[in-house]
């Protein structure tokens, strides 16, 4: 891994010889900067504007060079508000791209796009920084072995398994359990894989970012008493930030994740919420730079921008970055260029269902809508594949019978269909699971269920061996042995009541 050798802390590197320019034009978040002949900065170099505005307030704005215009001018996009900037102000070329702090000291902290901490906990205790612009790993470095990334969550591991070093799309509206699922994954990768997580909040609401931080502290994912024991680093570039910040915050989070993968040789989970906002910010910047828009008004470089981010998210021989990306679908139109370009990179989709959440089935992952390219016999094995297919078939048949049940009732079904419905209801409940991070809310201890245990449990339900057990025994338990123990307890309780 190429680590920028600067020891100047986050944001930008320093040069002994300053290359100075001056602001020639300001159009919103875009600056044109004039430099002396022969002293033009490179594309993606960080420029810093320091000075005072008309009322004497200190200004410190970092920009990134996007275009070389000719006539010794460059066009740069600001990473923070340009309020108070004036023509003629001095601009320093740092001679390097934006660099952000990396390493264990970033865990438990919140950063902005420049790698500056924004959580009022003081400076970050690291002198190692890394530039946010890097090429993707070379073919020779990639790990080509297809392997499943075990999450310990039954419904995910059985029906839509994640690929180690893969990319997963997370679809779900408000209030169906996206945040809790994300926090459980962060918790499980730390405990089962010794891995860490990086969360990139790209263009979402500031309130949601604050809520996530508070919930992480409450559930122990971020350890307030000993910040070094935390399992996640947070990088936020929210809705109120300029488009330059929203466009680059995903790269800041990815750079932190790459260090854990390449130097610490760990498995890393990278969350991006929301990948659509990354595209949206790129579209705004593209228009500000005067590029001709493409389909539906998106930037002509949409595929290139998405590819440059997604291709860096991969498994190497050192470690892996597995990415879970929340995908907003504008107007529910899956053919929109933004989600359509995202789908090309995804290995699996996890769809959260409001109907399941309303029934109290958590995690509310839809077993029929969620998909994975990993669910093939040659990758997961015949036993896993057959069990998953039978679970899906049983769930699909139950879904088809629901209208008949609603109109005529269960008694009008054939004996075979009644058996299918009974097993499907047990499966539906057994797909629920108590989470470690939800212990503080539910009072039930969390459960991590290995893949072999998950397959065994569903095979027993499908075989009919557990037909005599009540369906409530399968609700919010870990493995199948807990379900049988719960059934015995329910039987004892009912006998005592009599």
UniProtKB/Swiss-Prot annotation:
GO terms for biological process: proton motive force-driven mitochondrial ATP synthesis. ATP binds at residues 172-179. GO terms for cellular component: chloroplast thylakoid membrane; mitochondrion; proton-transporting ATP synthase complex. It catalyses: ATP + H2O + 4 H(+)(in) = ADP + phosphate + 5 H(+)(out). GO terms for molecular function: ATP binding; ATP hydrolysis activity; proton-transporting ATP synthase activity, rotational mechanism. Keywords: ATP synthesis, ATP-binding, CF(1), Chloroplast, Hydrogen ion transport, Ion transport, Membrane, Nucleotide-binding, Plastid, Thylakoid, Translocase, Transport. It is a peripheral membrane protein. It is found in: Plastid, Chloroplast thylakoid membrane. InterPro entries: AAA+_ATPase, ATP-synt_VA_C, ATP_synth_F1_bsu, ATPase_a/bsu_AS, ATPase_alpha/beta_chains, ATPase_F1/V1/A1_a/bsu_N, ATPase_F1/V1/A1_a/bsu_N_sf, ATPase_F1/V1/A1_a/bsu_nucl-bd. The keyword Transport applies. Its EC number is 7.1.2.2. It comes from the Eukaryota. PANTHER family: ATP SYNTHASE (PTHR15184), ATP SYNTHASE SUBUNIT BETA, MITOCHONDRIAL (PTHR15184:SF71). F-type ATPases have 2 components, CF(1) - the catalytic core - and CF(0) - the membrane proton channel. CF(1) has five subunits: alpha(3), beta(3), gamma(1), delta(1), epsilon(1). CF(0) has four main subunits: a(1), b(1), b'(1) and c(9-12). Belongs to the ATPase alpha/beta chains family. Produces ATP from ADP in the presence of a proton gradient across the membrane. The catalytic sites are hosted primarily by the beta subunits. NCBIfam families: atpD (TIGR01039). This is ATP synthase subunit beta, chloroplastic. It comes from Myristica fragrans. The lineage of its organism: Eukaryota, Viridiplantae, Streptophyta, Embryophyta, Tracheophyta. The gene is atpB.
